[in-house]
Amino acid sequence: MFKKPLITFLAITIGMFWQISLLKAQPIVLSREFGVNLGFSSFLGDLGGSDDIGRAFFWDIDPEVTRPALGIVYRQEIIPRTAFRFNAIASMVKGDDALTDNEFRHYRNLSFRSPIVEVSGEIELSMNRFTGIKKKRWTPYIYAGIGGFYFNPQAQYDGEWVNLQELGTEGQGLPEYPDRKKYSKIAVCFPIGGGFRVLTYNNWVLGFEMAARLTTTDYIDDVSSYYPNPDYYFLHYDLEKAVMAAALSNTSDGTRPDLIVPEGGRGDPTNNDAYIFGGMITFTYHMEFQRNVSSIKCYFSDDNK
């Protein structure tokens, strides 16, 4: 759902740099910022709290399972109004079928938690600048980019948190399901977001932003495709691990065979998971430096002095 805006954003950015490469360079003042951001995270995927089948967008957010998010951010202007930014953010995401009224999801009764440790780089476009003769002390901005993140879904078993990837709760790694491979706990994300920043009179910048992270994995919550036949665990695992895998693969109470059948649907394999960092308050320090950068007529001319 974000593919078209992302492609447009990247095309405009690439075109801008191509034009700049053809023009004469001159010294201008640019800005850089470094600081921290604090907000909340929320998971968007097969597990969630809305009354619909899980969907990767804001209307599937469950406020009950949002968790704090903390990170650092570095932003540097490449050309006026266009900056590169680097983010490193850590948080925990959660999901619980018990919180939804959707019949299938509530009966499925799965739950999870997973750490998210992300690093990413983005191109950011701002309406106004904090430097130059036309500088302002406020600006809205948008950004898009690419990053990578680590995740490790866990569920509770006998009062302890258990790593789910090693168990193969959908039959991953079992010879009976050669098409179900163990998933990696490292994946790619595509941040898309925006916000608003204000420059104070002592060079500190206070901002507020919200962003979605589309990903290349459907296993942040360890739920994607189909239930396995639990008997296969006992053919290949030791008894303790087989019992645990069977129990965490299907946590329903077995009273509704019309909803959950052996080797039937467990998740939605057609949509990858996503997560958001929302309500992010950024607190950065503003600095200026001079470098030779090409100019574009009209758009940058008055900012170069």
Regions picked out by a protein language model, each given a short descriptive name:
Residues A25-S31, P80-R81, R129-T139, Q156, ...:
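Short loop/turn motifs that connect adjacent beta-strands in outer-membrane beta-barrel proteins
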Residues L30, E64-P68, P115-V119, W138, ...:
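Residues that define the transmembrane beta-barrel architecture of outer-membrane proteins
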Residues V36-F40, I72-Q76, V119-M127, A144-G148, ...:
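Residues on the lipid-exposed face of transmembrane beta-strands in outer-membrane beta-barrel proteins
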Residues S41-A69, V73:
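Surface-exposed strand-loop-strand hairpins of Gram-negative outer-membrane beta-barrel proteins
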Residues S41-G45, N87, S91-G95, G147-P153, ...:
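Structural signature of outer-membrane beta-barrel domains
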Residues R55-D60, F104-F112, E176-K182, R266-P269:
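Extracellular loop and loop/strand-boundary signature of outer-membrane beta-barrel proteins
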Residues P80-E166:
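Gram-negative (and chloroplast) outer-membrane scaffold detector with strong preference
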Residues Y201-K305:
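Predominantly the C-terminal beta-signal and adjacent terminal strand-loop region
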